Every structure is written in structure tokens, then in C-alpha cells.
């Protein structure tokens, strides 16, 4: 173990206080010649690290799993999950939690190495990761953070100097992922499937203490836990929908209890507005299509509620009723959050009866004319309606008049309305073709400048800067349909 006081390591290991069935202690597998290719300076500082120290060889060795910082307690977490509806016992097959960094402000964040070698949960996998998917997770997770969407984050990416073998030979890499925690719906499913009520209670109590301490004294704290997670997920999914983000693999092991977005494998952002948009190559039935995401979140949360039944109430029928009552509230909470967000996207401060139909009409027209989701709202925000099939259509012109008169009815000025729109309609998202272009340059040519430029533009999605304009252009029709693969 290396001592790193100048660096800023301040690790704790509260997860290891859970019953040992929840994890396996295992060291990372060393790699031959690690090289740091990306470090997140601002995140490093907020975690209490000195970024310049993190660039030194001793710290790069930690990011590669060749050394451990003082206080590290590497472990692979066990969990279960419904993957495309099928239940499996799972676990960290190629990731290790090395500890929880306590920040200068007293916050706690998991530090996880992804691609750190095989674990008892690897299921015939090699425990390694390829450079492209690790850089992709870095780009998208940081873009999500800039969009103000709760997310895990990326501290560093190192190349390993070793190949990984998938369909082809690819350069290996390890991502250092930072999360409020890695406790998932699947973690609770794992506890419930093992049948120990004591273990289930231990996990629930730990989760409450870590994420929802305000409900610790609640007389029905496990019901309150379910309520809090439902609230967090309703807000999160609404935020996804409002920016056109499609996760692609909403299995229960990818739904966090903290309400953060996790696992950027086959995710992508929607170009043309279409409720049926799917990018993932393995989602052949469209289970996790854009328009299905709220329903799938409710389904996943129902699996959490099921797992909690043994501790919701001593009477099983009563426990079942509590679970059903709470799950039924998800759709109401989601709709409310989405509606509030959509009104902000259209500059609507007050509540009017016509607002719902105003929103629905616009979305219907966008789908009909295959309008670009992000750029339609961007154009409305800038009030520059260039020639597009949507903006040239008679029904849009009619809608535009209604919308303008609705804005004029408000007490707030139009200037304030457009300002609110600017703060809620990103002018830039990580366009799929731009992300691929950056990855191609980095992985194939070792040129990280394309990625750096993209990251710089994505860091301020609401800036409406002229420097970002080249990134606002949708892909050429030949670039569609875009397909994603579960590389992360």
C-alpha cells in the first residue's frame, strides 16, 4: 500500500461492515504498462485530491490496480438483476470498489476501478475493459453531469498496455468511476433471493444511513426508503426524457438506490424525436425504447418493492398492499416532474389549462416531421426558425401563434421566459456521431485532441456559445440508424 497524504486520499470502507455475503474481498489484477490518458481535474479537486499529484507514476499505478492507496479495501460487490426481464444472480464481474473517499466537505463517494480483472462474479469473462467504451463512459457521464442530471462520474482513464479480445483485438483500459454508492435495486434483489431477513435489514439500514439519514427515525423507515427511491427515480427519468437521453439497458442492476444514472454501455441521445427510438443492438424488442423508459423504471421499482416485502410489515398481505400503493405513485410523480420540466422548456411560468395540449401538439408535430429534438427547442429558445419541414408546416405556424399568445398572457416578461428556456434547453448534447469521431481518433490514432475539444464544448451545454455550433449539427442521414453495443 502506498501512503498518499499529499495526494489527498482519505478512504473509508463502510460497505465492508455489511454481512460478507454482499461482497468478496479480492485485489485488482496488475497490468503491464499503465499510462494515464485522461484525468478529470475539477472532479479530483472536489474529491479532495491534488490533480498534479494524481499524474505521478505512483498514482497512475493505483488507477491501474498495480498498487493500492493507504486505507484501500478492494472488494467486488454481489448483486442480482432482471436483465431484459430474466432474473440472474450477478455481481461486479470486472470492477472493484477500492474504498470510499471522504471529501473535505465530509461527503462520501465510492471509488471503483472498472476493468480491473476477473472476480468470482465474472461468469467466464476476462474482467477487462476496452479503451473505446471506457472513454465513451467518461464523455457521456461528464456530459450528463454538465446537463445537471444525477450521474456517476469518471475520475480517470488509464490504458493498460495489454490487449482485450472481443470481436477483435482492442487496447485495454481501466476507468476510475466515482459514485454516491453502487447500491442497486439488484443489491436488494440479491439480499431477498438469499432469504435472510437479517441481511435484508442490514442492507436497508446501511442504505438509509448512507443515503437517506433523514428517515432513520421514521416509524416505518423501510416504507420511507421505498418512497425516497421512487421519488429520486421519478425525477431522474423525467430529466432523461427532457433531454432525449436513452439509457438502453434499464435492467434492475443498473437502477441505483441513490438516484444516479449508472452504466453507459449502449446509451445514446435521440436525434429525431421518436418515442420508439432504440439504439442498443441487443434491445431487439424495443423494451428500453425512449418512450418506454418511464414504464420500465416503474417495473424495476416494483422489483425493489417486492424485495422489501419481508421487512415492510410483519403481515405479508399488509406488506404487499404497502408495496403496491407506493409503486402506484411513481407514474404520478414522474408525470408531474416531466410536465414541470417541459413547461420550463417552453418558457411557461404560470399554469394554464391549455399547457398540456400545447406540449402534446408540439411533440406530435415533431414526431410527424421527424424534427431534431434538441435543435427544435434550441431554435424556439433563440427564436430563429430556419427552414425545416416542421417550421414550414401550416400546423406549426398555427401552434407558434398559440404559444406566443400564451407567453404574452404571463405576468413574467417574454425576456424572462426566453431566459428560462435557455437554462432548460441545452444547445449541445453528446451527438452520437461526434462521440464516435472522438473515440475513433483516440483509439485508432492515439489522438485525444478531438475528445478534449468535444468535452470542452459539452461542459457548458446551456452557454449557447458560437464555439459550440459545429457540435449542434445533427448527423447526416447516411449516419443513421446509429447502433450501440454494451462495451462498458
From Swiss-Prot:
Q: Which reactions are catalysed by this chain?
A: L-seryl-[protein] + ATP = 3-O-(5'-adenylyl)-L-seryl-[protein] + diphosphate; L-threonyl-[protein] + ATP = 3-O-(5'-adenylyl)-L-threonyl-[protein] + diphosphate; L-tyrosyl-[protein] + ATP = O-(5'-adenylyl)-L-tyrosyl-[protein] + diphosphate; L-histidyl-[protein] + UTP = N(tele)-(5'-uridylyl)-L-histidyl-[protein] + diphosphate
Q: Which principal EC class is assigned to this enzyme?
A: transferase
Q: Which residues bind Mg(2+)?
A: 254, 263
The EC number(s) this enzyme carries: 2.7.7.-, 2.7.7.108
Location of the active site = 253 (proton acceptor)
Named cofactor requirement(s):
Mg(2+); Mn(2+)
Question: In this record, what's one Pfam family?
Answer: SelO
Query: Which InterPro entries does the protein's record reference?
Result: SelO (IPR003846)
Q: Which residues bind ATP?
A: 91, 93-94, 114, 126-127, 177, 184, 263
Q: Which UniProt keywords apply?
A: ATP-binding, Magnesium, Manganese, Metal-binding, Nucleotide-binding, Nucleotidyltransferase, Transferase
Q: Look up keyword Metal-binding and say if it applies.
A: yes
What would be an example GO MF term here? magnesium ion binding
HAMAP family on file: YdiU_SelO
Q: Which family does it belong to?
A: Belongs to the SELO family.
Q: Cite the PANTHER family for this sequence.
A: PROTEIN ADENYLYLTRANSFERASE SELO, MITOCHONDRIAL (PTHR32057:SF14)
Role according to the record:
Nucleotidyltransferase involved in the post-translational modification of proteins. It can catalyze the addition of adenosine monophosphate (AMP) or uridine monophosphate (UMP) to a protein, resulting in modifications known as AMPylation and UMPylation.
Q: What's the protein here called?
A: Protein nucleotidyltransferase YdiU
Tell me the lineage of the source organism.
Bacteria, Bacillati, Bacillota, Bacilli, Bacillales
Amino acid at each position: 500500500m502506498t501512503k498518499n497524504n499529499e495526494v489527498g486520499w482519505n478512504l473509508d470502507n463502510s460497505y465492508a461492515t455489511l454481512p460478507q455475503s454482499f461482497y468478496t474481498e479480492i485485489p485488482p489484477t496488475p497490468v503491464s504498462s499503465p499510462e494515464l490518458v485522461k484525468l478529470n481535474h475539477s472532479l479530483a479537486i472536489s474529491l479532495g485530491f491534488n490533480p498534479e499529484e494524481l499524474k505521478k507514476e505512483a498514482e497512475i499505478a493505483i488507477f491501474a490496480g498495480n498498487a493500492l492507496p493507504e486505507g484501500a479495501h478492494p472488494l467486488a460487490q454481489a448483486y442480482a438483476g432482471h436483465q431484459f426481464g430474466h432474473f440472474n444472480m450477478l455481481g461486479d464481474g470486472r470492477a472493484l470498489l477500492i474504498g470510499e473517499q471522504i471529501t473535505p466537505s465530509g461527503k462520501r463517494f465510492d471509488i471503483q476501478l472498472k476493468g480491473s480483472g476477473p472476480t468470482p462474479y465474472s461468469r467466464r469473462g476476462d474482467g477487462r475493459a476496452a479503451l473505446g467504451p471506457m472513454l465513451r463512459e467518461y464523455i457521456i457521464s461528464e456530459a450528463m453531469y454538465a446537463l445537471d442530471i444525477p450521474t456517476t462520474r469518471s475520475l480517470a482513464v488509464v490504458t493498460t498496455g495489454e490487449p482485450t479480445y472481443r470481436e477483435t483485438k482492442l487496447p485495454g483500459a481501466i476507468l476510475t468511476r466515482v459514485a454516491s454508492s453502487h447500491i442497486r435495486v439488484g443489491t436488494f434483489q440479491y439480499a431477498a433471493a438469499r432469504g435472510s431477513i437479517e441481511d435484508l435489514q442490514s442492507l436497508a439500514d446501511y442504505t438509509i444511513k448512507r443515503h437517506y439519514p433523514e428517515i432513520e427515525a421514521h416509524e416505518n423507515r423501510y416504507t420511507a426508503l421505498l418512497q425516497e427511491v421512487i421519488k429520486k427515480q421519478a425525477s431522474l427519468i423525467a430529466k432523461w426524457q427532457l433531454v432525449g437521453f436513452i439509457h438502453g439497458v434499464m435492467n434492475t442492476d443498473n437502477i441505483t438506490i441513490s438516484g444516479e444514472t449508472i452504466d453507459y454501455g449502449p446509451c445514446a441521445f435521440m436525434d429525431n424525436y421518436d418515442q420508439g427510438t432504440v439504439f442498443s443492438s441487443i434491445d431487439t424488442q424495443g423494451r428500453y425504447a425512449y418512450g418506454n423508459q418511464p414504464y420500465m423504471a416503474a417495473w424495476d421499482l416494483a422489483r425493489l418493492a417486492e424485495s422489501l416485502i419481508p421487512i415492510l410489515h410483519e403481515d405479508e398481505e399488509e406488506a404487499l398492499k404497502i408495496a403496491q400503493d407506493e409503486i402506484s405513485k411513481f407514474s404520478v410523480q414522474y408525470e408531474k416532474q416531466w410536465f414541470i420540466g417541459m413547461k420550463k422548456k417552453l418558457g411557461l411560468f404560470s399554469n394554464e389549462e391549455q399547457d398540456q395540449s400545447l406540449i402534446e401538439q408540439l411533440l406530435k408535430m415533431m414526431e410527424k416531421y421527424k424534427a431534431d429534438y434538441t435543435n427544435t427547442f434550441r431554435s424556439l429558445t433563440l427564436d430563429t426558425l430556419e427552414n425545416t419541414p416542421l417550421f414550414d408546416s401550416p400546423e406549426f405556424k398555427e401552434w407558434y401563434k398559440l404559444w406566443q399568445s400564451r407567453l404574452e398572457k404571463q405576468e413574467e416578461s417574454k425576456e424572462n421566459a426566453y431566459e428560462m428556456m435557455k437554462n432548460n434547453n441545452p444547445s449541445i448534447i453528446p451527438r452520437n456521431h461526434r462521440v464516435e469521431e472522438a473515440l475513433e481518433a483516440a483509439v485508432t490514432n492515439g489522438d485525444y485532441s478531438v475528445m478534449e475539444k468535444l468535452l470542452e464544448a459539452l461542459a457548458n451545454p446551456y452557454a449557447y456559445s458560437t464555439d459550440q455550433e459545429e457540435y449542434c449539427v445533427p448527423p447526416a442521414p447516411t449516419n443513421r440508424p446509429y447502433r450501440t453495443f454494451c462495451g462498458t
